[in-house]
């Protein structure tokens, strides 16, 4: 306990100003660590004579502990049996043996947070990825003859390069082109020629002396 005057017995400031919280608190008011005792509940094979800790989860049903005697057969099913070893030991109303239970060679271990139970939790599923637009021209496989023109529709005004697309490969491309998720960009030689002409005009205008 701190030897200083408690907060509620301190007088207010003479000037009427509100005191700050850091002026009222001190390091002596903080208690030291109380230790870390993790083994807070223990129920041994001896039953009531070998247990300590908070056993409020039993709710007064101490007859469920190992090593205790059952008064009569469970006829009306009023007892709640949360432990599997008790359910198997009281089949057909037989009493438990006086000695230590063969099913309980060690003390009962309660579940630990972060133990094997944590591995059974469902993992959060990742959201589905949005569909990607096919902006790049797909590379033809070697089985299709190595022709690049089978993957694009020839333009009506573009000059023919001499490589004619196959008739069998033209139909599936038309069906893919009609899809909203497919986008095919064809930069033909006509657009490239226009870009090169503009670049040449800019170079000529820079070389003309003013």
Swiss-Prot record:
What keywords tag this UniProt record? Answer: Acetylation, Cell shape, Cytoplasm, Cytoskeleton, Membrane, Phosphoprotein
Gene Ontology annotations for the cellular component aspect, listed alphabetically: cytoplasm; cytoskeleton; cytosol; endomembrane system; membrane; microtubule cytoskeleton; phagocytic vesicle; plasma membrane
Q: Where is this region: Disordered?
A: 122-171
Name any Gene Ontology BP term: actin filament organization
Q: Which GO terms describe its molecular function?
A: GTPase activator activity; opioid peptide activity; small GTPase binding
Please give the start and end residues of each transmembrane region: none
Q: Which cysteines are joined by disulfide bonds?
A: none
- Give the InterPro entries listed for this entry: Cdc42_effect-like, Cdc42_Effector_BORG/CEP, Cdc42_effector_prot_2, CRIB_dom
Q: Which residues form the CRIB domain?
A: 30-44
Tissue expr: Highly expressed in the heart. Weakly expressed in the pancreas and liver.
Phosphoserine modified-residue sites: 31, 101, 141
Q: State its location(s).
A: Endomembrane system; Cytoplasm, Cytoskeleton
> What Pfam families does UniProt report for this protein, alphabetically?
BORG_CEP (PF14957), PBD (PF00786)
Q: Which residues carry this modification: N-acetylserine?
A: 2
- What is the protein's quaternary organization? Interacts with RHOQ and CDC42 in a GTP-dependent manner, and with SEPT7.
The record's comment on protein family reads: Belongs to the BORG/CEP family.
Q: Which PANTHER family does this one have?
A: CDC42 EFFECTOR PROTEIN 2 (PTHR15344:SF4), CDC42 EFFECTOR PROTEIN BORG (PTHR15344)
Describe the task this protein carries out: Probably involved in the organization of the actin cytoskeleton. May act downstream of CDC42 to induce actin filament assembly leading to cell shape changes. Induces pseudopodia formation in fibroblasts in a CDC42-dependent manner.
- The molecule here is called Cdc42 effector protein 2
State the species of origin.
Homo sapiens (Human)
Starting at the broadest rank, the lineage of the source organism is:
Eukaryota, Metazoa, Chordata, Craniata, Vertebrata
């Amino acid at each position: 306990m701190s030897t200083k005057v408690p907060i509620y017995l301190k007088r207010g400031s003479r000037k009427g100003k509100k005191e700050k919280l850091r002026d009222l608190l001190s390091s002596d008011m903080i208690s030291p660590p109380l230790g870390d005792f993790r083994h807070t509940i223990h129920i041994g094979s001896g039953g009531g004579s070998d247990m300590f800790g908070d056993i409020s989860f039993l709710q007064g049903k101490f007859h469920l502990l190992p090593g205790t005697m059952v008064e009569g057969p469970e006829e009306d099913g009023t007892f709640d049996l949360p432990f599997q070893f008790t359910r198997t030991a009281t089949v057909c109303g037989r009493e438990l043996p006086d000695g230590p239970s063969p099913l309980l060679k060690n003390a009962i271990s309660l579940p630990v947070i972060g133990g094997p139970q944590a591995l059974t939790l469902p993992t959060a599923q990742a959201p589905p990825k949005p569909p990607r637009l096919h902006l790049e021209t797909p590379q033809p496989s070697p089985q299709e003859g190595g022709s690049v023109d089978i993957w694009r529709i020839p333009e009506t005004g573009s000059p023919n390069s001499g490589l004619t697309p196959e008739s069998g490969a033209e139909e599936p491309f038309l069906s893919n082109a009609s899809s909203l998720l497919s986008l095919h960009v064809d930069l033909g030689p006509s657009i490239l020629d226009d870009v090169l002409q503009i670049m040449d005009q800019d170079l000529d205008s820079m070389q003309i002396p003013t």
